[in-house]
Amino acid sequence: MADKLVPSSPADASEPLFSFGVIADIQYADLEDGYNYQRSRRRYYRHSLIHLQGAIEDWNKESSMPCCVLQLGDIIDGYNAQYKVSEKSLELVMNTFQMLKVPVHHTWGNHEFYNFSRDYLASSKLNSKFLEDQIAQHPETTPSENYYAYHFVPFPKFRFILLDSYDLSVLGIDPSSPKYEQCMKMLREHNPNVELNSPQGLSEPQYVQFNGGFSQEQLNWLNEVLTFSDTNQEKVVIVSHLPIYPEASDSVCLAWNYVDALSIIWSHKCVVCFLAGHTHDGGYSEDPFGVHHVNLEGVIETAPDSQAFGTVHVFPDKMLLKGRGRVPDRIMNYKREEAL
């Protein structure tokens, strides 16, 4: 919608309540440039680190310093595992992040699981759960250790929730485990192809091996947190590697059970924005319930003369995404409260 891309009021010039940075799909590898699986888009494996350095330099000198940065997953490329340099590449990227003056919240994508097991990630620097906020009086809002998700409060009356969109997945877990068997059964029920990464002929093309989903346990937890946020009159931003809204994403990139996640979000009034990566070419749509779904353009497919990151400035009535390079600016107005 065109009206989302133009300033809506003179208040745009006022100071934001707070700001935060967003970046997705860095997918660094010490490799020559290559192409995506369809060989239709170029990938700049080495230059992604230079893009990250540029983003950090920008964030560090912004007048409205971000309170944190959301890293939306796929921090290093799966090729690192083939060359047995996963730990080395991760260390290089994490050392680059050390130059940033604010905390980073990391989500986990498919490329994390091409390189590392879930157990490894849980004890790595990519586990940013230590940054979570807990609601002491409401233990039901404390996440289980069975999935990687948490919530935090960057500013009073705003809550950010990081989801684990590979909670249901055949990636990164022991093939002899019951959960692997359960997830493989689920995948094969929806995808009869020999090549499980192929969506060919599928009525639900999101059921491919490079995607995943949300367990009922995690969805129940999400529902509890959103219930608290409704009661507490908070505005909520949800963060996930995988997108959940078809109008904002290629259907082959959606979370397996995106419908279940949407139905919970739509049963609450507090969610204002859902941020995801994974698609690389970006996407945006406002759903019928006024939730803004933003899929961030991926660093990995961004030419050396461009950029792909953004800063979101948060105001009492809206969020303004100030994009860099191929990330477009967006004005995301909060849905109006229904008249009493």
From Swiss-Prot:
EC code(s) of this entry: 3.6.1.13, 3.6.1.16, 3.6.1.53
Sorted UniProt keywords: Acetylation, Hydrolase, Metal-binding, Zinc
Record's catalysed reaction(s): CDP-choline + H2O = phosphocholine + CMP + 2 H(+); ADP-D-ribose + H2O = D-ribose 5-phosphate + AMP + 2 H(+); CDP-glycerol + H2O = sn-glycerol 3-phosphate + CMP + 2 H(+)
CDD domains: MPP_Nbla03831
Gene3D superfamilies: 3.60.21.10
Pfam family, one: Metallophos
Residues involved in Zn(2+) 2 binding: D74, N110, H241, H278
Residue numbers carrying N-acetylmethionine: M1
Annotated binding of Zn(2+) 1, by residue: D25, Q27, D74, H280
Cofactor dependency: Mg(2+)
Presence of the UniProt keyword Transferase in the record: no
Domain of life of the native organism: Eukaryota
GO terms of molecular function: ADP-ribose diphosphatase activity; CDP-glycerol diphosphatase activity; metal ion binding
Xref: InterPro entries: Calcineurin-like_PHP_ApaH, Metallo-depent_PP-like, MPP_ADPRM
Subunit structure: Monomer.
General function of this protein: Hydrolyzes ADP-ribose, IDP-ribose, CDP-glycerol, CDP-choline and CDP-ethanolamine, but not other non-reducing ADP-sugars or CDP-glucose. May be involved in immune cell signaling as suggested by the second-messenger role of ADP-ribose, which activates TRPM2 as a mediator of oxidative/nitrosative stress.
The family this protein is said to belong to: Belongs to the ADPRibase-Mn family.
Name of the molecule in the record: Manganese-dependent ADP-ribose/CDP-alcohol diphosphatase
Organism encoding this protein: Mus musculus (Mouse)
Name of the gene encoding the protein in the UniProt record: Adprm
